[in-house]
Amino acid sequence: MTSPLCWAAATTTVTSPEQAPAPSSKAKGSKVHRSKSMGRAQAWPAHHPKSATSFHAMKSSVHAQVLELQRKIQLLEGDRKAFYESSQWNMKKNQDTINQLQEETKALHVQLKDLLQGDSKVIQAIIQEWKSEKPFLKNRTCEQALEHLEHQLREKMNQLNALRHQVILRQKRLEDLRLQHSLRQLEMAEVQDSNMEAAKTMRNLENRLEKARMKAEEAEHITNVYLQLKSYLQEESLNLESRLDSMEAEVMNTKHEVQELKVVNQEAINARDIAKNQLQYLEESAIRDRKKREHYITDCKKRAEEKKLQTERMERKTHRDHVLLQSEDTIQDHQRHREEELRQRWSMYQMEVMFGKVKDATGVAESHAVVRRFLAQDETFTQLENLKKDNELALAKLKEEKQRLQRELENLKYSGDATLVSQRRLHEEMQKTFKKEEQRHNDVHERLEHTSRILQLVKDCLEHLANKLSHVKLDDTVLAGKKLDRDSEDYAYNLLVVVQEKLLKLQDQLESQDVPELLRHIADREFLATLEGKLPLYNTRILLPVASVKDKFFDEEESEDDDRDVVTRAAFKLRSQKLIEARSKKRNRLRRS
């Protein structure tokens, strides 16, 4: 270092001659100090070694003092930075403490303000909670507001006590009314016990009348349902056969089209496979040709590299000999003679190498035989030239044929792809059409099954109704004495006609009868039947002679048998539900198979 402090320390320090010179890299790097020391060394005479030793010792001591001063300066700088950081941290801590104390002071000021304004705060809080008391508490103190609120509280307590007293009085009144109601109920029970027989008779009559009305309404409803079914079946029977025939024809046509499309699809797949095989064969042949060419090229390159290496070796050898010859500058004549000899040797060596190659190529050891062989090779050379030209022409033709086949392959590839795409699109369209037709066929099949179920249900209902009306005889109709065939197609229609005529005949017979009297007679019989059903098993019933004439339309035994044979609505629904479930299970099994 070249600071004035260092130079002053160097001038004031006394060095001892026994210290060994140990200059550091920093002291050696000082330009000014080096120049002065060099100047002094040059100025001193060469026969004073002790003065040079003292100079080096002084130089090393100065350098040690400089390092010590630098170390002290670094320590002072570190102390200064630590003191600065600690002071900054203390300032930050004091600032945080000041901010906290300011916030606490603000909070204490707010509390003091609230304490000074306590009455107004309390009144404002009361006004916000009870806005209805605002005009009474607006300009009052806290004590006045509390007195006012206590007064209102006392009034509300008085009102509450008055309401409680009214509630107690009304509860007592309610208990009295309940007691009176229980007494009235006991009186009504006594009156009802006295009139129980008449009330029971009235209830039984009302029940029988209601049952008769319900049966009449049910019969009307069944008649309307059968008429609707008859009209619906007549309409369906007109169009069902033609629609089924047309649907079957459409299904057959669709199947034929699907078979044709399958054949076309198989042909397209076969053509695609053939094209793929041809393309693969051409690609493999092209790869083999390319590999052959690459192998031939690599062989040629290897031979060329070998020739090149041989020539380089020969050139290096000649160059080395030439350099050795040129290094002998003293013997020029010998050099010329040496050069001529080397040229001759080199020419002889080249001739030997060439002759060896010719011998290797021709397989002849003598020179005159080699000459004869070369003369005989003229005709062979001409033949080889002709063969080369022919091979070049054949190669050109083969290249043209290859290009033509490549173009045909590209055309076939693109045309085959286009044909395949069109065939796929056509196949997808036909698949969609087939799915639509199959869906329509399934819908028609479901409708047919539904219609057949309805027809079977109608047949069962008509047979049941015909069995009920078997006592009604038809005289002036075509189907009166004719027995209906159950397996015939017109069985349901003929049975419906018979049932309709019987119902019309019954309706005509009922018009001439007294309907209220018949209903009363039915109700009496039902009442007696219910009484008999309630009797215990050990009770013996004594039949009294009946003076009234039996009605031919309401035989008791016949009506009981009919009631046993009548299918209720719940049983009818259960039977139809079982039939639908069986059909659906059968359809699911067919679809899965």
Curated annotation (Swiss-Prot):
Phenotype of gene-disrupted mutants: Mice have a spectrum of laterality defects, including complex congenital heart defects associated with heterotaxy, and airway epithelia show largely immotile cilia with loss of the outer dynein arms.
GO BP terms, alphabetized: brain development; cell morphogenesis; cerebrospinal fluid circulation; cilium movement; cilium organization; determination of heart left/right asymmetry; determination of left/right symmetry; epithelial cilium movement involved in determination of left/right asymmetry
Keyword Coiled coil listed: yes
Biased segments, Basic residues type: 28-37
InterPro entries tied to this protein: ODAD1_CC, ODAD3
Ranges where the record places region Disordered: 10-50
Subcellular location, record wording: Cytoplasm, Cytoskeleton, Cilium axoneme; Cytoplasm, Cytoskeleton, Cilium basal body; Cytoplasm, Cytoskeleton, Microtubule organizing center, Centrosome, Centriole
GO cellular component term of the entry, any: ciliary basal body
Pfam families linked to this entry: ODAD1_CC
Keyword presence, Amino-acid biosynthesis: no
Sections of the chain in a coiled coil: 84-317, 378-449
Keywords assigned: Cell projection, Cilium, Cilium biogenesis/degradation, Coiled coil, Cytoplasm, Cytoskeleton
Primary location recorded for the protein, binned into one broad class: cytoplasm
Function: Component of the outer dynein arm-docking complex (ODA-DC) that mediates outer dynein arms (ODA) binding onto the doublet microtubule. Involved in mediating assembly of both ODAs and their axonemal docking complex onto ciliary microtubules. May be required for motile cilia function.
Subunit note: Component of the outer dynein arm-docking complex along with ODAD1, ODAD2, ODAD4 and CLXN. Interacts with ODAD1. Interacts with PIERCE1 and PIERCE2; the interactions link the outer dynein arms docking complex (ODA-DC) to the internal microtubule inner proteins (MIP) in cilium axoneme.
Protein name stated in the entry: Outer dynein arm-docking complex subunit 3
Species of the source: Mus musculus (Mouse)
